[in-house]
């Protein structure tokens, strides 16, 4: 099984504060990997490192075959990334956004044109073609942002709280898109604060105070910790850490 992310003893410090404390895990091709943790748990710091935006204090990190210390620029060019703010330009049209990001990733005009036609048809955006992104419903913005994040067919895409603020039906539709992308062999690395969404992942890790306190499939973790839901497990881990 191809490994797209390999992390070994990752430590990130800010002065005396340890944001990431000896993190070790692997993520595989075509896997949907949930990266869970409360605000301040350290997951955002770790994601910045995995995306090539920051260096670790120590430890080994490889993403898509590239070393974080030597190949940060290559990592940035070979991953997809979607933030909860969607990273779209509201004053540009749909086609202009696709053209802009396709150009950043070095795609040819022919490929960009083909992708534009494909996305407009897939999302039913014919009536919005000449209108700015700001005119789009939130759910459609979300789906378009995801498609643009994988326009260059990266081995891995990072999704940072991608379903924040959308209704349950749109969330479900978005997850269908995630499954379709994973079926193509793309690794999907996702953070979410919706504990029910964790159940949709192949495996999840749960961070508490800078450490990974649980790692495995949702079923494995619920069985191991004797909980009915991932939310119960999350609360249990937080309480255990606080009591210790």
Identify the meaning behind each predicted range.
Residues 215-216:
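ABC ATPase "signature
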Residues 99, 103, 110-128:
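Conserved ABC ATPase "signature" region
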Residues 59-70, 74-75:
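Conserved ABC transporter NBD signature motif
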Residues 157-161:
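Catalytic Walker B motif of ABC-type/P-loop ATPase nucleotide-binding domains
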């Amino acid at each position: 099984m191809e490994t797209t992310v390999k992390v070994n003893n990752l430590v990130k410090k800010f002065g005396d504060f340890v944001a990431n404390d000896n993190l070790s895990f692997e993520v595989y091709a075509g896997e949907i990997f949930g990266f869970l943790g409360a605000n301040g748990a350290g997951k955002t710091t770790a994601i910045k490192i995995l995306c090539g935006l920051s260096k670790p204090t120590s430890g080994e990190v490889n993403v898509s075959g590239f070393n974080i210390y030597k190949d940060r620029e290559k990592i940035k060019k070979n991953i997809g990334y979607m933030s909860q703010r969607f990273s779209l330009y509201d004053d540009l049209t749909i086609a202009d956004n696709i053209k802009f990001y396709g150009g950043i990733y070095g795609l040819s005009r022919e490929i960009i044109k083909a992708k534009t036609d494909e996305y407009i048809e897939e999302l039913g955006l014919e009536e919005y073609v000449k209108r700015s992104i700001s005119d789009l419903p939130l759910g459609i913005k979300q789906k378009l942002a995801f498609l643009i994040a994988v326009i260059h067919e990266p081995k891995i895409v990072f999704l940072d709280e991608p379903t924040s603020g959308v209704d349950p039906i749109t969330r479900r539709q978005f997850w269908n898109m995630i499954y379709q992308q994973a079926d193509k062999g793309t690794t999907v690395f996702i953070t979410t604060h919706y504990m029910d969404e964790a159940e949709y992942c192949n495996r999840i890790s749960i961070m508490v105070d800078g450490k990974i306190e649980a790692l495995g499939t949702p079923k494995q973790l619920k069985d191991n910790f004797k909980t009915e839901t991932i939310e119960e497990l999350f609360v249990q881990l937080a309480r255990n850490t606080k009591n210790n």
